[in-house]
């Protein structure tokens, strides 16, 4: 049955309108979670996924993070073959095995950490980045092992390590195995320290739980992106526990910098050059 509009609008116009509407690619626009402006995705990507309206740093994938940070040439992924196992046969409302399969399909990653050897403005480095979209960037056995293998490359080649954290903490589905990764990664970083090899921890939004209580806060330099949420327990959990309203901006990177918990805050478009200059000083390779 035709509508009253069909009588007034020629069929050729209606068909052209439908064709035009269907030709707009999906995912061409993205809404800023802070200012709520609708942003053109290609322009947003050119701006390193930072909102041009309010300068909010949007969350990015692990590979996007490493692509922004490392030089384009000479990259080599570390421990890419490692895959997680459901050794405990864990099941809550869903089997852990199924959660892993869903996360792998959604992200294209085998687990929540990507490690790469590459260069920063020509300086050899190893960089690792958490994939928050993979089970909240939670740390399990494979995340811990990839981190340690990245540390081993740094020890072998005597090059710096940079870690971009974005995690909800330890992976509950791996229970004690997950908690062991806190000690494992911390022990690996102690080996770097003993050898005098620099480790810079970059905290991005968000960093919580066992990751914030271990590798994220153990850098020779602890830095963060603007407005990143960083802590151990989340603000809602704390408010429910202490039954008090938290201060404005509590657990944001600016608040932590003011209280001395961070060394500096670096904008995304300044990250490469700022960290290159710092690592040049720490490795005595100032041009």
From Swiss-Prot:
BP term (GO), one: malonyl-CoA biosynthetic process
Gene3D superfamilies assigned: 2-enoyl-CoA Hydratase, Chain A, domain 1
Q: Which SUPFAM superfamilies does UniProt cross-reference here?
A: ClpP/crotonase
In this chain the CoA carboxyltransferase N-terminal domain maps to 28-287
The enzyme's E.C. designation:
2.1.3.15
A Pfam family reported for this protein in Swiss-Prot or TrEMBL: Zn_ribbon_ACC
Task: State the UniProt keywords alphabetically.
Answer: ATP-binding, Cytoplasm, Fatty acid biosynthesis, Fatty acid metabolism, Lipid biosynthesis, Lipid metabolism, Metal-binding, Nucleotide-binding, Transferase, Zinc, Zinc-finger
Q: In which pathway does it act?
A: Lipid metabolism; malonyl-CoA biosynthesis; malonyl-CoA from acetyl-CoA: step 1/1
Q: Which GO terms describe its molecular function?
A: acetyl-CoA carboxylase activity; ATP binding; carboxyl- or carbamoyltransferase activity; zinc ion binding
Q: Where in the cell is it found?
A: Cytoplasm
Tell me which GO cellular component terms the UniProt record holds: acetate CoA-transferase complex
Q: Where does Zn(2+) bind?
A: 32, 35, 51, 54
What does the record say about how the cofactor binds? Binds 1 zinc ion per subunit.
What is the first-listed, main subcellular location in coarse terms?
cytoplasm
SS bond list: none
Cofactor(s) required, per the database record: Zn(2+)
Which EC class does it fall in? transferase
Q: Which top-rank group of organisms is this from? A: Bacteria
Chain positions of all zinc fingers (C4-type): 32-54
Reactions mediated catalytically: N(6)-carboxybiotinyl-L-lysyl-[protein] + acetyl-CoA = N(6)-biotinyl-L-lysyl-[protein] + malonyl-CoA
Family matches, as InterPro entries: AcCoA_carboxyl_beta, Acetyl_CoA_COase_Trfase_b_su, ClpP/crotonase-like_dom_sf, COA_CT_N, Znf-ACC
Its family? Answer: Belongs to the AccD/PCCB family.
Describe its partners and assembly state. Answer: Acetyl-CoA carboxylase is a heterohexamer composed of biotin carboxyl carrier protein (AccB), biotin carboxylase (AccC) and two subunits each of ACCase subunit alpha (AccA) and ACCase subunit beta (AccD).
Q: What does this protein do?
A: Component of the acetyl coenzyme A carboxylase (ACC) complex. Biotin carboxylase (BC) catalyzes the carboxylation of biotin on its carrier protein (BCCP) and then the CO(2) group is transferred by the transcarboxylase to acetyl-CoA to form malonyl-CoA.
Q: What is this protein called?
A: Acetyl-coenzyme A carboxylase carboxyl transferase subunit beta
Q: What lineage is this protein's organism placed in?
A: Bacteria, Pseudomonadati, Pseudomonadota, Gammaproteobacteria, Oceanospirillales
């Amino acid at each position: 049955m035709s509508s009253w509009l069909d009588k007034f609008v020629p069929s050729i116009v209606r068909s052209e309108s439908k064709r035009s509407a269907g030709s707009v690619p999906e995912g061409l626009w993205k809404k800023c979670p802070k200012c709520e402006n609708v942003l053109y995705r290609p322009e947003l990507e050119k701006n390193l996924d930072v909102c041009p309206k309010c300068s909010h740093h949007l969350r990015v994938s692990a590979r996007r993070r490493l692509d922004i940070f490392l030089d384009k040439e000479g990259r080599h992924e570390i421990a890419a073959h490692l895959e997680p196992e459901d050794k405990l046969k864990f099941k809550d409302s869903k089997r852990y095995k199924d959660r892993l399969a869903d996360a792998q399909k959604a992200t294209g990653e085998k687990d929540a950490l990507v490690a790469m050897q590459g260069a920063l403005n020509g300086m050899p480095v190893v960089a690792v980045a958490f994939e928050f979209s993979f089970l909240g960037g939670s740390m399990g056995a494979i995340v811990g092992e990839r981190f340690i293998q990245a540390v081993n490359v740094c020890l072998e080649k005597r090059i710096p390590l940079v870690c971009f954290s974005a995690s909800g903490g330890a992976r509950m589905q791996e229970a004690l195995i997950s908690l062991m990764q806190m000690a494992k990664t911390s022990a690996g970083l102690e080996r770097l320290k003993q050898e005098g090899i620099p480790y810079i921890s970059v905290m991005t939004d968000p960093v919580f739980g066992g990751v914030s209580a271990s590798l994220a806060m153990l850098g020779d330099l602890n830095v963060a992106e603007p407005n990143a949420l960083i802590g151990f327990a989340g603000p809602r959990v704390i408010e429910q526990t202490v039954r008090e309203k938290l201060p404005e901006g509590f657990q944001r990177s600016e608040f932590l910098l003011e209280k001395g918990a961070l060394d500096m805050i670096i904008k995304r478009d300044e990250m490469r050059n700022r960290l290159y200059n710092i690592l040049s000083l720490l490795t005595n390779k100032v041009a």
